[in-house]
Amino acid sequence: MAIKLEDKKAIVAEVNEAAKVALSAVVADARGVTVGAMTGLRKEAREAGVYVRVVRNTLLKRAVEGTEFSILNDAFKGPTLIAFSNEHPGAAARLFKEFAKGQDKFEIKAAAFDGKFLAANQIDVLATLPTRDEAIAQLMSVIQGATSKLARTLAALRDQKEAAAA
């Protein structure tokens, strides 16, 4: 089905706006995935703050031109499903990775984060990034552990001095 020029321009503009504000992008091939499964993926994506769209490769190349995601151009082959993470860099990768577990025909092609190209086998790096809240919790745990160790050391030192004085 042919798309009118105005519609193509609108698609390019929409995807370009999504790319400009995105933290990361993941590209996948969704051939053979049922409509129901894709609808479920789109619903989960909305809830996770991820922009998901199937776009023709030529339009996608134009849309990401001038953004940090233009490094994905070589991955735009065959039917392309692109996801842009808006709130957390690992959200799209995590979403696609979970979705791929239940779909044999769903194939993650590549990703881009912070101006770097990530091949399909490197997606785990992006998917396992902690969320902001998880990172803060980990940091607080480290700080709390260090302060409690310091307190125990000072208490042991005090006890040692008291024992020596007595």
From Swiss-Prot:
Any one GO cellular component localisation term in the record: large ribosomal subunit
Alphabetical GO biological process terms: translation
Keywords annotated in UniProt: Ribonucleoprotein, Ribosomal protein, RNA-binding, rRNA-binding
Coiled-coil annotated spans: none
Secreted is among the record's keywords: no
The keyword Metal-binding is annotated on this UniProt entry: no
CDD domains hit by this protein: Ribosomal_L10
Family annotation (InterPro entries): Ribosomal_uL10, Ribosomal_uL10-like_sf, Ribosomal_uL10_bac, Ribosomal_uL10_bac_type, Ribosomal_uL10_CS_bac
Cross-referenced Gene3D superfamilies: 3.30.70.1730, 6.10.250.2350
Protein family (similarity comment): Belongs to the universal ribosomal protein uL10 family.
Function recorded in the entry: Forms part of the ribosomal stalk, playing a central role in the interaction of the ribosome with GTP-bound translation factors.
Known partners and oligomeric status: Part of the ribosomal stalk of the 50S ribosomal subunit. The N-terminus interacts with L11 and the large rRNA to form the base of the stalk. The C-terminus forms an elongated spine to which L12 dimers bind in a sequential fashion forming a multimeric L10(L12)X complex.
Name this polypeptide is given: Large ribosomal subunit protein uL10
The species this protein was found in: Pseudomonas entomophila (strain L48)
